[in-house]
C-alpha cells in the first residue's frame, strides 16, 4: 500500500491530476535547479498542474514521482516529491531515470543507484527493463503517444556513496557514473590498466555509444574492484597525511581554517552553477570537525587514530570543495563530459609538456569567427594555417558548433589545433597569415620548400592544372531542381557502384574535399533553399548524378589518372631525392622498344641505404609531429580510433600506415618494457622498425582486438593503393 501525503489524484493518470485544483506546482526548493537544467516554469506546467499540450519540439514532459527507500519500517516507502520534467526526445529510454533525476537536481551517485518503474494510466506498474529490450530505443519511440498518461516512479536507494553499494546491485548506469567520476582523476588509458574494463569499452560506455548493456557479471566485477580502489585510495591518503602532519604542533599550510572551510562549503552549496550536489553525510561532517580542529594547534589529547581519521576526512572535504569550485566556473551544461583530454598542436620544434594541458574553450567557434574578422582572412587560409585542413571542413565545423565536451576524437584534434593557434600572439598569427598568402601566390616556391618545412606548413597549396571537372560549375541554379533527403542514399549507392573513394567523388561531383563529403553524409540535413550553401552544393551533386552512367565512369577514370600523374610530377620536382627518382626510372622493365636513354651506362647496384630512401620520404616523423603524437598518447591513449588516425594523417601530412606503425611500436614497448619508447631529440623513421618490434595480433589482449583489426585494414588499404598506383606511374614514365 502506498503511503502519500498528497491528494489521491496523484496516484492516477496525469489527466486526472491536470483537472484537480488541489495539486500544486513543484516545490519551490527545486525550481532553481530545474530552470538551471533547462526546464523553464512556463514549459514545465501551469499553475493548476496541467501540462503543455505542444510536444512537437525536442522535449517530452514526463511526470516523475521520486520515492526514498530507507531502512526503517516507518519510512519504508516515503515519497520525496512529484513534478514534471522535460526530457529530450533523443535520450535513450534506458537512461530516462538518470536523466530525470539529474534534471531534478539529484547527484550522479543517487541517479546511478535509482530504479525506475513506469505506470501507464491505471495499469499495473512495470520496471523500465521489462518495457523494451531494444538498447537503442529512445524516449520518443516509447512515450511519444502516451506521455500524457505515463507516470515514472523513481526509487532511490539509501546508499550515499557508490562504494557503499553492494556488488550485486551494480548495473550499467552505476558503472557509467563511476567511470565518469574516475575519469576526472585519470585518463582512459590509465584507468583501463587498473580496472577490469578495456579502454574502448570505457570510452563507449561513458559516451553512451555502447548500446548493449554491460553484463551483470562484468558490472559486479567492476563494483568489487571499485570498492577496493576507493579503500586503497583512502588508506593512501591517510598515510600521506600522517607523514605530512605527524608533528602535532605544525599546522598544514594547504589545509584552510575550518571556519573558512565551512564558509566555502556554504558558498559552494549556494552556487547556482554547480552541477555536483554532495551527499548529506559529507556536508554534515564539516561543522562536526570544528570543535576537534581549532585554528591553532591540534589537540594533543586526541588519540592518533582519531587524528588520522579527522585529517583524512578534512582532506577529502577539501578535495570535494576544490572540485565543486572548479566545476562552478564551467558551463552549466558541462555535467560529466570532462573526461577526455586530447592533444594540442604545438608550434615549437621541441614539444612542450605544458601544451598538453591546453583545454578547448566552449566559445572556440566564436573565437574563430572573431579572428576571421580581425585578420580579414578567408576560411581557406585560416583552415590551412590553423589545423591544415580545407575550407569546406572548417565551414562545416563552424556551422555545426558541436560541444567540445561531447565531440569525437577527430573533431577534438582539430579544435585543439585551432585553440592552440589562437593562443599564439597576434603578431605571430599575422605573420603566419602573410607567409601563407605568399605561398599561395608562389606555389612553385612553396612546393620546393615543402620538403624541409614543418608538418603544419608542409601541405602547402600546389600548382593546380586543369582537371576534368573544370567544366562543372561550382554553383548552379537550383530553382528547377528537385532535391530531397534521398540524395544522400544516392551518393552512397553511386560510390559503391563505381567503387570510388569519398575523396574522388567529392572532387568530381562538387569540387570539395573528402572531409566535407564525410560531414555531409554524417549529418544528412534536410535540403532546403533557405540553406543556400548546402542547396547549391547538392544541386551541383545532383547535376553530376544526372549524367549518364558511362560519362560518370569516364570522369572517374580521368580524375584518377590525373591524380596519379600529378602525384608523379610532384615526386619528380622534389629536390631531396633526384638520385632515387633516376634510379627508379632506369630500373623499370621495358616491354616495347628501348628508348635512347637506356644507352647510358647502367647505374651501380642498389645498396641497402638507397633502397631505404623511398619509404623514408613518407615514413619519417619529424620532431614536431613526434611531439603531437606523444601528446596524443599521453592524453588519449595508445588506441586511437579510425577517425582520429585519419585526422592525424591529414594534419601531420603522413600516411596512415606510418601513424599505425608508430602506435604499434609504442604498444610493443609498453607491453614488453613497461614504458613508452623514448626519442631523445631526434626524428623517427618507422621504416627502421623491425617486425618483432611491432605488437602482433597474437600478443594483443581481448580488449585490443578491435583496434588491431582496424590497423590491419588500414595497412591493407594503403598497400592496395600503392599497388594500384604502380602501373599508372609506369605508364607515365
Swiss-Prot record:
GO CC aspect terms: chromatin; histone deacetylase complex; nuclear matrix; nucleoplasm; nucleus; transcription regulator complex
Cross-link Glycyl lysine isopeptide (Lys-Gly) (interchain with G-Cter in SUMO2) residue location(s): 24, 30, 161, 350, 475, 724
Domain CMP, first and last residues per copy: 57-158
Residues where Phosphothreonine is found: 467
MF-aspect GO terms: chromatin binding; DNA-binding transcription activator activity, RNA polymerase II-specific; DNA-binding transcription repressor activity, RNA polymerase II-specific; RNA polymerase II cis-regulatory region sequence-specific DNA binding; RNA polymerase II transcription regulatory region sequence-specific DNA binding; sequence-specific DNA binding
Biased composition (Low complexity): 441-458
Keywords per UniProt: Chromatin regulator, Chromosomal rearrangement, Developmental protein, DNA-binding, Homeobox, Isopeptide bond, Nucleus, Phosphoprotein, Repeat, Repressor, Transcription, Transcription regulation, Ubl conjugation
Disordered as annotated region, ranges: 1-47, 435-473, 580-617, 691-733
Record PTM text: Sumoylated by PIAS1. Sumoylation promotes nuclear localization, but represses transcription factor activity.
InterPro entries: CUT_dom, CUTL, HD, Homeodomain-like_sf, Lambda_DNA-bd_dom_sf, SATB1/SATB2, SATB_CUTL_sf, SATB_ULD_sf
Subcellular location: Nucleus matrix
Coiled-coil parts of chain: none
Sequence positions bearing Phosphoserine: 20, 39, 454, 594
Highest taxon listed in the record's lineage: Eukaryota
Ranges annotated as DNA-binding: 350-437, 473-560, 615-674
Tissue: Expressed in cortical neurons that extend axons across the corpus callosum. Also expressed in branchial arches and in cells of the osteoblast lineage, but not in chondrocytes and osteoclasts.
Alphabetical list of Pfam families matching this protein: CUT (PF02376), CUTL (PF16557), Homeodomain (PF00046), ULD (PF16534)
Database matches in SMART domains: CUT, HOX
Biased composition, class Acidic residues, residue ranges: 694-708
Quaternary structure note: Interacts with PIAS1. Interacts with ATF4 and RUNX2; resulting in enhanced DNA binding and transactivation by these transcription factors.
PANTHER family named among the record's database cross-references: DNA-BINDING PROTEIN SATB FAMILY MEMBER (PTHR15116), DNA-BINDING PROTEIN SATB2 (PTHR15116:SF15)
Function: Binds to DNA, at nuclear matrix- or scaffold-associated regions. Thought to recognize the sugar-phosphate structure of double-stranded DNA. Transcription factor controlling nuclear gene expression, by binding to matrix attachment regions (MARs) of DNA and inducing a local chromatin-loop remodeling. Acts as a docking site for several chromatin remodeling enzymes and also by recruiting corepressors (HDACs) or coactivators (HATs) directly to promoters and enhancers.
Stated name of the protein: DNA-binding protein SATB2
